[in-house]
């Protein structure tokens, strides 16, 4: 979301090459394999609008399932940033999926055809599309994987921290990790986080807010069967509270990526072998 000093919003219009020609959207697009999502939004702004931008905050993380004109169904996870212009000159994209970029007053934007996620982000009233029937998850490559994962820095009223240990045979095996994992097809990140929390630790939690957005790229990762995979995961981390903690136990089926779960005091956590994500989240949370 990029706003001018007078409140106008920067929007782009879908071209004939897009799934929805003539429909307006916030600038942005897909994350390339191995790319940090923050770098992706800066790149997409430059491509679609000619403007250089700097990120000032993370607005939200959302997901939607949309029926495309060709009859297929697409699940998209979206990270919405707040950005400010730092340079460049406004111009349309050339031979891309957008054909116009404009600063639009909010009152005018409310009357434009907007993609649903854009209308929601701007707080504009619109008719919610009908729910899309969701079939089986489309197949994806196993040698080059890009996933979207939701994780939690989980605490209880006593200040303990909940961690899950990565099973041997998985990347990071033996390290203590944040509860969480990949989002399922048609699942929101929040729902995925709470589902994974129960599967990996037997806890029921409440999401209090977003802590961070990041990624991990490991082109030489090995899967559980020892098969090489060009692995890229985009990760969102939430603050999660378990008001009524129970004994931590793994409930997901044998063969999953977690082999143990436990509550720890902050002093105990300091002596554990932690995953990179767990270390980063604990440092960010203070």
Listing of model-derived features with the role each one plays in the protein:
Residues 1, 125-153, 166, 227-228:
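Acidic, metal-coordinating catalytic segment for phosphate/diphosphate chemistry
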Residues 18-22, 170-174:
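A conserved beta-turn-beta hairpin within the catalytic core of GNAT-like acetyltransferases
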Residues 24-29, 174-181:
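Conserved acetyl-CoA binding element of GNAT-fold acetyltransferases
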Residues 31-54, 64-118, 183-206, 214-277:
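Unchanged
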Residues 59-60, 211:
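Local beta-strand/beta-hairpin segments that build beta-sheet-rich folds
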């Amino acid at each position: 979301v990029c706003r001018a000093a007078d409140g106008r919003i920067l929007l782009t219009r879908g071209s004939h090459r897009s799934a929805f020609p003539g429909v307006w959207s916030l600038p942005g697009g897909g994350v390339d394999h191995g790319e940090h999502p923050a770098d992706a939004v800066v790149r997409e702004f430059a491509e679609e609008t000619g403007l250089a931008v700097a990120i000032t905050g993370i607005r939200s993380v959302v997901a939607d399932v949309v029926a495309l004109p060709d009859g297929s169904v697409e699940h998209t996870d979206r990270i919405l940033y707040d950005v400010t212009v730092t340079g460049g000159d406004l111009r349309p994209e050339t031979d891309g999926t957008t054909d116009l970029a404009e600063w639009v007053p909010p009152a005018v934007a409310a009357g434009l055809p907007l993609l649903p996620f854009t209308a929601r982000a701007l707080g504009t009233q619109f008719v919610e599309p009908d729910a899309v029937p969701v079939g089986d998850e489309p197949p994806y490559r196993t040698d080059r994987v890009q996933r979207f994962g939701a994780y939690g820095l989980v605490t209880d009223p006593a200040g303990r921290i909940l961690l899950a240990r990565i099973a041997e045979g998985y990347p990071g095996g033996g390290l203590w990790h944040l509860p969480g994992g990949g989002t399922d097809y048609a699942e929101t990140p929040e729902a995925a986080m709470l589902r994974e929390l129960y599967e990996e630790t037997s806890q029921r939690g409440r999401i209090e807010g977003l802590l961070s957005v990041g990624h991990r790229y490991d082109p030489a990762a090995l899967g559980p069967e020892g098969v090489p995979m060009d692995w890229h995961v985009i990760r969102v981390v939430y603050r999660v509270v378990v008001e009524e903690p129970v004994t931590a136990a793994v409930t997901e089926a044998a063969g999953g990526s977690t082999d143990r779960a436990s509550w720890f005091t902050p002093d105990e956590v300091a002596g554990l072998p932690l995953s990179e994500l767990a270390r980063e989240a604990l440092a960010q949370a203070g």
